């Protein structure tokens, strides 16, 4: 299907639709429904600006319901610069988003339509997204997320991150969460409750331009492995209590 190496390297945009019809100009189409009964269809069309590239469409009547295991969904889509969810991608049953966008070429992503209330695993969700400059989270629910390892690892184009929507009470691993985000200058962790985090190893390692992180009153490192937490970073202070 569209996860074949050829398409993963040549798809430039992804759009979710609320119907499962395939247009006549589709180069190739696939039944990507779990039961293989045609409920979810994916197809590619040559891109208007570059006919050697493709636009991917994924559709189902009333929108696509994501599989509970949505790991690697767009992993390695090295040419994808845009993903249009259009409120047609229901993530309410998803439990793992492990490496969901890893190595994708997206520059911006809007996750305001995502329902992540059941997700427990966001390990390397955006890992190695070197072109990613902006993430819009909205009311992003992380209250059940246990694993945030490498979530933003090697996101070298990110300059700011506002994670004030994050609830981290159940999170145990933040290892390498921001590791090698070399252009990150500002990160807001005001909502982070880290009392159950057991590892923060390499959390900010290699953040060579990050000087200040802002945390709230529920930030603590007392239960965590903090080896190399700030190794190679520019962090000069952890600012507590300026969370408004």
Q: Where are the predicted features?
A:
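Negatively charged
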Residues: 1-244
